[in-house]
Amino acid sequence: ENILPIEESGQLRYIDVRGSSDGKLGETQFTGNISVRFVSGHTEAMMLPQIKYKGKTIVYMADLLPSAGHIPLPYVMAYDMFPLTTLHEKKSFLQEALGGDYILFFEHDPVHECCNLQQTERGVRPKDYFKLSAI
């Protein structure tokens, strides 16, 4: 009920988490440079903000990949609500990120703020580590 005045004044914008007509989670575009993708393995409809900056796509990894140590398959967190969904979403995202040369920005990594990716014999792995301020 506390949110009703904000909604009634037109200041509240709901985000449609369904990105396609098939009902799968998708992506919502806010501006030409800012979008949010949705994943549902860790929690339902968790938001991963994506920002295009200086020709790169920076993705805030939230709890899909909380640290660089979670990049290798099949590492997922034991308390994910749907760990098999996380694994599927992670695998798909890593291939997209590798192909698009995305910058991954980690929420919980105590050592590494960001990295890009490379394909190795053992799968997708971090390539270079750097601070967000270096972009």
Short names for language-model regions:
Residues 19-22, 43-45, 66-67:
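Short, catalytically relevant binding-site loops at active-site mouths
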Residues 41, 49-54:
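Active-site beta-strand termini and strand-to-loop segments that position acidic
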